[in-house]
Amino acid sequence: MAYFFDFPTDTWVEDASPGGPPKRAFGHGLAAGSSHFASPVSRRRLPTITALLLFSLLSASQSGALSVSQCSRRVSLGPLLSRVSSVSCTPSAAASALASSLYPTDSLSSVEGSVAPRPPPSSLAFVLRRVPPAAYSSSLSPSVLRFKHSLPRPLQGSLVCAPGILGGAAGSARFAGCCGSQGRSCGSGKNPELPLKGSKDEVIPRVGTSTAGPRPDWFHVPAPQAASRGAEESRYQQLQKQIRGLDLHTVCEEAKCPNIGECWNGGTATLILLGDTCTRGCRFCAIKTSSKPPPPDPLEPEKVADAVAKWDIDYVVMTSVDRDDMPDGGAGHFARTVQLVKKAKPSMLIECLVSDFQGMEESVRTLAQSGLDVYAHNIETVRRLTPYVRDKRAKYDQSLRVLHLAKQFNPSLFTKSSIMLGLGETSEEVVRTLRDLRDHDVDVVTLGQYLRPTKQQLGVVEYVTPETFKKYQDIAEEMGFKYVASGPLVRSSYKAGEYYMKHLIDDARKHGRRETVKQVKLEADVGTLKGTTTTFQVNEKEA
């Protein structure tokens, strides 16, 4: 295969694998030390180890080409390069180094290309500076900045830029923007912003780099409450103990949510179904990932129903990791859990915060008609930032379509989505995203501040003020959303029970009805996973 990397120089390696003619795949958009490849033939991820190897080879020389003496030295960048301990300057050794770090199981028999004559073996330029075919040139956007800022901060300071690495006028311009005209370490000082499409105001978030400064005072939250005097355990402690005993997972704990004490003591919990390992790698999320996670617990629906029936809560949010490895994305597992919870506690209000199920209509239908009360799917960010923030399989328009399908399959459902702010979006983009959600019949929207869970996730670009959140809330309400929750500490499931019930009560008041919900009815066939949606009945206001 011919791989095109978004590195400081156009790079491609031809893999003449046995069993077929050479194939080509290309990719761009380096993030978190890995490049995403996209083509009809191949969709693969470049490991961090290879990114560091290639960049260290380029950084070893001011000219971007390695001499024999430079090639013979050992490459030592810590455990990330443990699989490639030395590099030789001969073509065969270079091919072996690339192959072993890229895909150890692949057969990389040649790195010779058909575009230019083979350079002399005294340089590795034939690997690192190969010019791709003209047909693919427009797909490449080399950038020292984008690569450097995708690395952990300690490694950024050890990478040295040189004008010769990029070559040409465009390369010199990028070099000057990163390191200055004389050349210096990129690790010193503040990292420059990355403007997109010529706009100085449009920036993208970067892994390991936060430009927002210290957290403002409005992010201070109270610690979880202990038991009150005379009581054995607080509501928070009771939930925590029961969750541990049933071997269940909550997003409140996994994501280190700052609102856990307020939500749990307020009677709202968010459970994670389908395990704790995700098949996707969104750059804002700290949940562990794997292409082949363990199978879900077949008894999990029963465990959840048993737990919820015992808890002193009136609203439960059930979310999950993405399970692209399952034929239905886990929709059937979700639906059965909803049915069993409703059977065990009919008064329970259930919100399901789910993935896009890869856009599979039947999966959306299965869950939408399972008996849940709120169908939630988060669009997460604005259209421009989606490729930088979410996994490559998560598409902006696909998320909108899934929310619209859920409403079509069950018009009585409340649909809900959430937007994270502080990732470099503009106010116009936020308003456009709100409009897109409303145009697809989304009923409820929440807006909250993005907070980086660990240093391995995207940095915070800015802390949005409470006044700005209030402005977005007013705009969203004018658009016709049935309920809007907007604030720095608001999360998709933050105090969801209170928000949801408040919306119902306010809606009843507007229509001249009683201030309380009188009855919740459920008719569902648990065995077939089919049933009518929960309907709320309220009495007319007495004359």
Curated annotation (Swiss-Prot):
Residues at which [4Fe-4S] cluster 1 binds: C252, C257, C263, S493
Record keyword RNA-binding present: no
Signal peptide stretch: 1-63
Catalytic activity field: [[Fe-S] cluster scaffold protein carrying a second [4Fe-4S](2+) cluster] + N(6)-octanoyl-L-lysyl-[protein] + 2 oxidized [2Fe-2S]-[ferredoxin] + 2 S-adenosyl-L-methionine + 4 H(+) = [[Fe-S] cluster scaffold protein] + N(6)-[(R)-dihydrolipoyl]-L-lysyl-[protein] + 4 Fe(3+) + 2 hydrogen sulfide + 2 5'-deoxyadenosine + 2 L-methionine + 2 reduced [2Fe-2S]-[ferredoxin]
Gene Ontology cellular-component annotations: apicoplast; mitochondrion
Sequence positions that bind [4Fe-4S] cluster 2: C278, C282, C285
Required co-factors: [4Fe-4S] cluster
GO molecular function terms listed in the Swiss-Prot or TrEMBL record: 4 iron, 4 sulfur cluster binding; lipoate synthase activity; metal ion binding
Domain named Radical SAM core: residues: 264-482
CDD domains to which the protein is assigned, alphabetical: Radical_SAM (cd01335)
One Pfam family from the record: Radical_SAM
Localization terms from the record: Plastid, Apicoplast
Gene3D superfamilies: Aldolase class I (3.20.20.70)
Main localization category: plastid
Pathway stated in the Swiss-Prot or TrEMBL entry: Protein modification; protein lipoylation via endogenous pathway; protein N(6)-(lipoyl)lysine from octanoyl-[acyl-carrier-protein]: step 2/2
E.C. number(s) listed in UniProt: 2.8.1.8
NCBIfam families xref list: lipA, PRK05481.1, PRK12928.1
Entries under PANTHER family matching the protein: LIPOYL SYNTHASE, LIPOYL SYNTHASE, MITOCHONDRIAL
HAMAP family membership: Lipoyl_synth (MF_00206)
Protein name stated in the entry: Lipoyl synthase, apicoplast
Species assigned in the record: Toxoplasma gondii
